[in-house]
Amino acid sequence: MGFIDGDKVIPSTKRGAKGEMETVAEQVTRNCVNARSRQNREKDKAIELLDIQISNNCLDENKILILNADELSVSNNLTGLIAMGIAAKYKKPTMLGRISPDGYLKGSIRGREESELKDFKSFLKGSDYMDFVEGHANAAGFSIKESDVSKLYDYANKELANVDFNEGFYEADFVIQGNYSEIT
């Protein structure tokens, strides 16, 4: 297997650009940007639907969010990305999954490392309600009996009663222009 020369000129695969030429690098870049845009549209649509679930069920009153993605028409491959978006928006550890035929909620967790709860995975394991939680401290796969979800909410609300997930958290979003050496 060899390397592909990014400067090599090839026929464009861009819609409406029949007969035009572009470099491999241009084509790969365009395809990646388009894939990311599709992924973001799906993620944003899913987050909007989950916002309704959270609002209708007053789930944001809990210390953690446990959400059901069964009604979402998005790929299972985006579960972690969507959970990360919800965790960032609500500033709470989030579990997002789908109900399996055997009655388990299975999916992805995303924690908030900048909060007092540094290891969401260990917290969940310590509850004794989880079938499994495997992965990183704040990004992992999980499984819990659907019947244990309310028990986990009770456990989390009690154990995390004094944790303020907004405390000490400041979101900054800005663009720096110019020479980085000018920043002091």
Regions found by a protein language model. Give the residues of each.
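Long, low-complexity segments enriched in small/aliphatic residues
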Residues: 182-184
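Hydrophobic helix-and-loop "lid/oligomerization" segment in the mid-to-C-terminal part
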Residues: 1-154, 167, 171-179
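The C-terminal output helix
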Residues: 162-164
